[in-house]
Amino acid sequence: DGVEPTAENIENGTYTVSRPFNVATKGELTNEAAQDFMNYIMSTEGQAIVEEEGYIPVDGAEAFTSTNPSGSVTVSGSSSVSPLMEKLKEAYETVNPNVSIELQTSDSTTGMTNTINGMCDIGMASRELKQEELDAGLVNTVIATDGIAIIVNNESPIDELTSEQVRDIYLGNITDWSELG
């Protein structure tokens, strides 16, 4: 669509190829350590890490104040969210060394299923939650937005694609560059 994939364009919606990084819990968190970690993720300090790692932070973050709980937290899911979550985990554990966080990397659906089944405290998804996941009691929180750059080989005669063309390529409706004529 002729729009550069910059943070500003992703935030203002003119560049539309992006996805949310969601975390989900089964209803209200009862694990005090997990709630404290969630508060950290959504804080000014947590969102600064989101931005440092190249993602778009959420608005409205406030300074973090820990309740200083102890215990363990299990986070499960998306391999796309996992590298960011690892950075957030490391930073939080320096703020509160009395909490141990186990990060289980798999995929978004496994993370949501594990959360629904009580196998983890927090699930990670690099997509919107499905209606059946919400119906099962999951509560999602967007922790970041991930802009996705569409890259074409320099040797290709194509120097710009529309959103519809990209969609059709990924759906298999366009299978040859000549079809973009």
Where would I find each of the regions flagged by the language model?
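Exported/periplasmic ABC-transporter solute-binding proteins
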Residues: 1-181
